[in-house]
């Protein structure tokens, strides 16, 4: 035991002897790193997957910053990001962040959690590193050095470092997938969010000519405002809109209401109204918006004069990170606040143009949805939150569920899928009269088909990789584990002579695993668009990474499911992973479990039977969700 302790002490002492610690968090600093490392006795620490990968490819010895954090640290970072993102609720600053009774600070929370998780993780890593190497000089980017100034006086910036690395906002830097062409002759590419927004505005201008019902609504009719709904995804809902006395108004600010022939036809046949910026904007509104921006600029100056509050609130484990975060956050909030003035005024005008009986949203997290919730409360309009994905029905997953806007904290009614989520909501203390299990429109056309069922052409892998808003997901271990999981599935299906199709999760940040698949088998097909249900219908087996809604799709379609565990978020185990409706496995057991499901009919049939039972618990009114949704809205008004 004494020898082991001495060895640890020697290793620790060796670590302290490095003259320079190079903090490598941006591949744009690679040239500076090469020059610095070649001249001095130094230790290199990478801070994300990209920097780790390039150092590994160049065979440059280095450590990863994750090594300085424990799982407990990662959980604490996540919890702190959630709590700090609630800064806007503090009484001392509340009078400076309201505009027309809408809390502007609350509108950035969803994006801010993403920013904070990444930032706090780096802050705590640098703090731990500074304590480990007390005698060393730290060399790094402007971003790293700005933070490290709080922990060490011995810092040197890379000569050519640029500040922009730390100032890219998640929503602004998102690349939007665009597809042009026809079904069998098309190409997909990604464009910036700003370009997408401009193209969206141009595409919406002809809507009043293409959709004659816009602006021809009866004054006393009952109107439902539907916010951020995709017509193709909610096809059966849109198909049934015309068969009711309700008038539906679609208001999509993040995505266009229609973008191709199919979505246009659905909108037209639904007889709904499309409202856009172009249909609401005029010279009077323009003046109101300009005046509002002038007003809020003054309030923002007063807001950030509360230095002591921000210094105290923006802290982690007793360590304030406000001094390094201040400039970024001030500019960020000002930018978003000015953008929100226009959005608030547009939505206010829309809500004055029609008398809405209720409002339908898919999440409480989005900025436009939060505006609607706050403006609706002023007008006493009930808001209905429609569950839009399978959720972690666990106590451990509560904070994450709230952050994602799937818990009805502000909505008047919660339209959930079925019994399991209904019971979970009650356990959270949500009143029974607020919860309504009505099924889900997207599953209306997901049904067992004997002809397609018998095809069993391939194994289907549904990816659901690490996100950028969870501290554990940011670690190299989880990122590489996800890639290794995909590679392992490719290798095993090839080994067993099975065709493999990989369906990529629709998130814009999702890894495209084409390069992994090609390394193993060039015949593996990777699909990154379209619905997954038709693919499940013809597959022999679905392999889902972790817990995802596609498990329910497969249960409904009578397909066996393997859930391959990759991430470690601490969200607990949801019912679907405990009720034997799918075979839960990991990388070590995957080979044996895959072989069993493919070759043992008894195991396969039992999984299918359990899956069918689970789907009945998760989803009420199967194949009838749209009718139940419309029926509920009719009764509500």
Which residues are covered by each model-predicted region?
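Catalytic-core helical/loop segments in enzymes performing group transfer/polymerization on anionic/lipid-linked
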Residues: 1-637
């Amino acid at each position: 035991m004494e020898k082991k302790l001495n060895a640890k002490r020697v290793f620790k002492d060796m670590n302290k002897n490095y003259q320079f610690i190079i903090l490598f968090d941006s591949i744009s600093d690679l040239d500076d790193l090469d020059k610095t490392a070649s001249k001095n006795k130094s230790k290199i620490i990478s801070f994300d997957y990209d920097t780790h990968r390039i150092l590994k490819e160049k065979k440059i010895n280095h450590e990863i910053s994750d090594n300085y954090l424990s799982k407990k640290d990662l959980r604490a970072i996540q919890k702190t990001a959630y709590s700090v993102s609630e800064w806007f609720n503090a009484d001392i600053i509340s009078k400076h962040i309201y505009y027309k009774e809408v809390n502007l600070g609350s509108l950035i929370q969803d994006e801010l959690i993403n920013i904070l998780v990444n930032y706090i993780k780096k802050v705590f890593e640098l703090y731990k590193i500074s304590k480990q190497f007390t005698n060393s000089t730290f060399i790094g980017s402007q971003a790293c050095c700005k933070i490290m100034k709080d922990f060490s006086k011995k810092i040197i910036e890379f000569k050519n470092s640029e500040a922009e690395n730390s100032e890219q906002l998640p929503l602004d830097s998102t690349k939007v997938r665009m597809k042009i062409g026809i079904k069998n002759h098309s190409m997909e590419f990604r464009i910036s969010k700003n370009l997408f927004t401009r193209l969206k505005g141009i595409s919406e201008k002809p809507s009043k000519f293409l959709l004659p019902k816009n602006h021809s609504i009866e004054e006393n009719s009952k109107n439902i405002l539907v916010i951020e709904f995709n017509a193709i995804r909610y096809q059966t809902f849109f198909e049934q809109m015309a068969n009711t006395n309700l008038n539906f108004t679609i208001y999509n600010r993040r995505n266009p209401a229609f973008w191709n022939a199919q979505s246009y036809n659905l909108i037209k046949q639904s007889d709904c109204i499309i409202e856009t910026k172009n249909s609401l904007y005029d010279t009077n509104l323009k003046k109101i918006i300009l005046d509002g921006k002038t007003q809020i600029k003054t309030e923002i100056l007063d807001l950030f004069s509360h230095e002591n509050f921000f210094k105290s609130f923006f802290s982690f484990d007793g360590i304030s990170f406000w001094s390094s975060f201040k400039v970024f956050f001030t500019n960020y909030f000002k930018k978003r606040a000015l953008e929100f003035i226009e959005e608030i005024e547009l939505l206010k005008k829309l809500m004055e143009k029609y008398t809405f009986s209720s409002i339908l949203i898919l999440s409480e997290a989005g900025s436009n949805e939060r505006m609607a919730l706050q403006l609706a409360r002023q007008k006493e309009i009930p808001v209905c939150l429609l569950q839009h994905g399978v959720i972690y029905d666990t106590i451990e997953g509560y904070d994450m569920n709230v952050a994602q806007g799937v818990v009805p904290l502000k909505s008047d009614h919660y339209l959930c899928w079925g019994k399991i989520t209904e019971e979970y909501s009650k356990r959270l203390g949500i009143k029974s009269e607020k919860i309504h299990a009505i099924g889900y429109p997207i599953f209306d056309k997901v049904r067992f088909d004997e002809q397609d069922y018998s095809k069993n052409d391939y194994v289907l892998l549904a990816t659901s990789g690490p996100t950028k808003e969870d501290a554990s997901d940011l670690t190299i271990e989880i990122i590489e584990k996800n890639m290794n999981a995909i590679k392992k599935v490719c290798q095993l299906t090839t080994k067993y002579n099975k065709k493999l199709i990989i369906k990529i999760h629709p998130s814009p940040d999702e890894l495209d695993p084409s390069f992994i698949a090609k390394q193993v088998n060039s015949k593996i097909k990777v699909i990154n668009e379209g619905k997954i249900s038709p693919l499940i219908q013809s597959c022999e087996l679905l392999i889902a990474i972790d817990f995802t809604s596609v498990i329910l799709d497969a249960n409904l379609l009578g397909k066996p499911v393997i859930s391959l565990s990759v991430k470690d978020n601490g969200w607990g185990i949801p019912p679907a992973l405990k009720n034997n409706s799918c075979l839960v496995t990991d990388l070590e057991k995957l080979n044996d479990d895959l072989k069993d499901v493919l070759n043992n009919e008894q195991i396969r049939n039992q999984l299918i039977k359990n899956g069918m039972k689970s789907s009945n618990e998760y989803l009420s009114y199967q194949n009838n969700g749209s009718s139940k949704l419309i029926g509920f809205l009719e009764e509500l008004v």
